């Protein structure tokens, strides 16, 4: 890490980011049609209202929308066993992220015969035997699927999964026996509708355990309206972790431990950002907090690469392909341009002979953060006292309270399946 000696973590009280969210305002199922969701537009402290079907009306031509194309995996696996008393005991394994041996995530999803993941286990005390076994059928072939506990650290387990078929992938296994992991505040089992509607229409990169929900509103018709206006569409990947639902339990945000997530950015997008960021009338619009955190993280990873070069060191170490929770603030004294930072990353990728930046980010965007790449954010309405709400406060200041009060008073639906908003930034 590159520490700034004058850096102090923000000590904002999380209580200042609380509001009353009645259960009746939470969306427990999606709107009938994706683009029917309501859209609140915030620009220079003025609130406007529309629907996602008309979102192109609020975005200028030649703007760039950047989407997260991560796909939610069926990460919940149930093992059921009937004991001698004829009582069914259920053990649920919730796959969080693959162990280091099986990263990037694509490698874990395409693994054959064996793979290991960091997992949560529901009913862990019921797990008495060494190995859990489940039978399944894929392509008319009977397969035995095994789960074995390897280790436990801080309430999470390392689970080794294995199966007795040489060509079936872990992705195929999950598609048959796994369940879509709905957010914890949706207190129901996932159904057939969720398999479609808790995915964006453009999701292709398997690995998330929660949907990048800002994109759920974008239907084919919405994409067509964006294209008609020459609004450019680009894609990156952040695999959303279960930590996205973790409330900030500490009294002040500096005491919160931000979760880390994998990001993947193609070299073509880095080239594009280098040439098209900071240009008047060509704003960069992040679709979702995950896209925003990824884009901003790419800038700071470029800063780290530049600092490394200034020290005349040959290669950026592997552990520096991770952005720590507060590193963006520690590095803020370095005022490199977008072109400089993107060039540094391009040089790094070219030196490695790779077409994709794969890294981890813990970036925590809070009030006081200076946005480097993004000009606007499209996002849903977030939980009280959450790190996602802190991002809204970083954009709007105390105006978030006015925005959320307006949404509550005007029957907007909140959280993952709810309505959304478009925030324009004027504090760059």
Predicted regions: what they are:
Residues 2-428:
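Surface-exposed, charge/polar-rich loops and edge strands
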């Amino acid at each position: 890490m590159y520490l700034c000696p004058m850096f102090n973590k923000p000590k904002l009280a999380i209580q200042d980011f609380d509001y009353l969210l009645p259960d009746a305002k939470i969306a427990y199922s999606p709107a009938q049609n994706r683009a029917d969701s309501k859209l609140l537009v915030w620009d220079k402290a003025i609130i406007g209202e529309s629907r996602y079907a008309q979102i192109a009306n609020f975005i200028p031509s030649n703007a760039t929308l950047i989407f997260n194309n991560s796909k939610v995996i069926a990460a919940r696996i149930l093992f059921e066993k009937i004991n001698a008393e004829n009582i069914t005991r259920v053990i649920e394994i919730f796959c969080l992220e693959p162990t280091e041996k099986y990263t990037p995530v694509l490698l874990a999803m395409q693994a054959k015969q064996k793979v290991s993941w960091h997992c949560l286990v529901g009913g862990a005390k019921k797990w008495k035997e060494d190995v859990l076994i489940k039978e399944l059928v894929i392509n008319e072939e009977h397969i035995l699927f095994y789960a074995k506990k390897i280790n436990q650290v801080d309430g999470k387990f390392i689970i080794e999964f294995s199966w007795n078929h040489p060509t079936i992938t872990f992705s195929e296994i999950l598609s048959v026996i796994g369940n879509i992991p709905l957010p914890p505040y949706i207190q129901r089992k996932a159904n057939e509708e969720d398999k479609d509607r808790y995915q964006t229409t453009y999701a292709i990169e398997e690995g998330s355990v929660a949907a990048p929900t800002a994109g759920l509103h974008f239907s084919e018709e919405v994409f067509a309206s964006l294209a008609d206006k020459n609004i450019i569409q680009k894609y990156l990947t952040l695999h959303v972790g279960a930590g996205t639902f973790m409330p900030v339990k500490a009294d002040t945000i500096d005491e919160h431990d931000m979760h880390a997530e994998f990001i993947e950015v193609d070299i073509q997008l880095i080239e594009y950002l280098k040439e098209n960021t900071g240009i008047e009338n060509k704003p960069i619009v992040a679709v979702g907090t995950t896209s925003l955190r990824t884009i901003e993280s790419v800038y700071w990873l470029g800063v780290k690469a530049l600092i490394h070069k200034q020290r005349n060191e040959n290669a950026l170490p592997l552990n520096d392909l991770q952005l720590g929770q507060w590193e963006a603030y520690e590095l803020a004294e370095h005022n490199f341009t977008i072109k400089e930072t993107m060039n540094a990353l391009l040089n790094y990728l070219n030196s490695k002979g790779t077409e994709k930046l794969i890294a981890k980010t813990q970036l925590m965007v809070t009030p006081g953060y200076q946005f480097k790449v993004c000009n606007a954010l499209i996002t849903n309405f977030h939980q009280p006292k959450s790190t996602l709400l802190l991002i809204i406060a970083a954009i709007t200041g105390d105006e978030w309270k006015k925005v959320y009060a307006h949404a509550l008073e005007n029957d907007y639906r909140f959280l993952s399946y709810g309505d959304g908003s478009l925030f324009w930034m004027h504090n760059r």
